[in-house]
């Protein structure tokens, strides 16, 4: 299989040249374009998530030999979460070569966080299957770059941080309420309210409930004394 000029340019951005280019094509093929043949990237995404986790766990252990499991876990989560994968995908301009069905393309799929994050994990798996663990590790460390060393020791997801803040002050856990759902079925938008027992609250909107909850929790955290 011969790759298009756009795909070759993406290979260059990855810093890896495929011996089996069909793996890269599959990694960049979303289910909206291939549901009948199952030649999409879902299985590769599953594998890539595990490869990414192993590489990041190893990198963190080597970067800080004195860190405890409790210190490493939140850093690890910050590096492998979908938002970070999507951020890396955007930097590599993965959206430009993502193969989507017409409806997904029309709804802005090339910019969707979930699709970009999933495709980035699938690309990692494609590199792993094509060139082995060392090749995948090299690509991951190149793309994630300084994030491995810059991720803060107290990095943790916003919902966990907000719950810890509440518990430290004797409050019950924060509650999250779906305020509004809008948009078409293929591209829903959720507005979530995060509220503390003392009445302080914040709202946020995102394309997935979990992301909206995290954004609302972060917004509320940022407003606290």
Swiss-Prot record:
Catalysis performed (reactions): Endonucleolytic cleavage to 5'-phosphomonoester
Domain (RNase III): residue spans on this chain: 7-132
Cofactor(s), names only, from the UniProt record: Mg(2+)
Binding-site residues for Mg(2+), renumbered to this chain: 45, 118, 121
Top EC class for this record: hydrolase
GO cellular component, one term: cytoplasm
Catalytic center residues: 49, 121
Record flagged with keyword tRNA processing: yes
Claim: Ribosomal protein is one of the keywords in the record: no
One of the GO BP terms on file: regulation of gene expression
EC number: 3.1.26.3
Record-linked PROSITE patterns: DS_RBD, RNASE_3_1, RNASE_3_2
Self-association state and partner proteins as the record states: Homodimer.
Described purpose of this protein according to its UniProt entry: Digests double-stranded RNA. Involved in the processing of primary rRNA transcript to yield the immediate precursors to the large and small rRNAs (23S and 16S). Processes some mRNAs, and tRNAs when they are encoded in the rRNA operon. Processes pre-crRNA and tracrRNA of type II CRISPR loci if present in the organism.
Protein name, entry field: Ribonuclease 3
Source organism per UniProt: Ruegeria pomeroyi (strain ATCC 700808 / DSM 15171 / DSS-3)
